[in-house]
Amino acid sequence: MAQHHNTALRRQIGNRLRDLRVQAGITSQEKLAFSAGVHRTALGRLERGESGVTIEVLAAVLAPLEISLAAFFQPFQSMMLSAAPRRRR
């Protein structure tokens, strides 16, 4: 179950990143990857949800889009809270 949740979260992160890139008028993954200092194939895998991402890499990719980490993750807040392990009493 945790594996399925991780895969779903990676896909949602990738979809959000792709949407923000397109909204910013950057139609080419290659342009964003170059601006962020990451390889285009790594960005492609990230957008497709095929790989996880570190906070450092995500921040680098978001910088050319002028999006903060807080703004990026804001739509995921309720999802992350519901996925948090609950303490036993």
Give, region by region, the residue ranges found by the protein language model.
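Short, charged recognition helix plus adjacent turn
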Residues: 2-3, 63, 73-89
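Basic, helix-initiating cap at the start of DNA-binding domains
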Residues: 3-16
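Short amphipathic helical patch at the helix-1/turn junction of helix-turn-helix
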Residues: 11, 22-23, 52
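Short basic helix-loop element that most often maps to the first helix and adjoining turn
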Residues: 15-34
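Conserved hydrophobic/aromatic packing and binding residues within compact polymer-binding modules
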Residues: 17, 32, 43-46, 72
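Helix-turn-helix DNA-binding elements, focusing on the entry/boundary residues of the two helices
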Residues: 17, 28-29, 40, 55-58
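Recognition helix of helix-turn-helix/homeodomain-like DNA-binding domains
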Residues: 36-53
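DNA major-groove recognition helix of helix-turn-helix/homeodomain DNA-binding modules
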Residues: 54-71
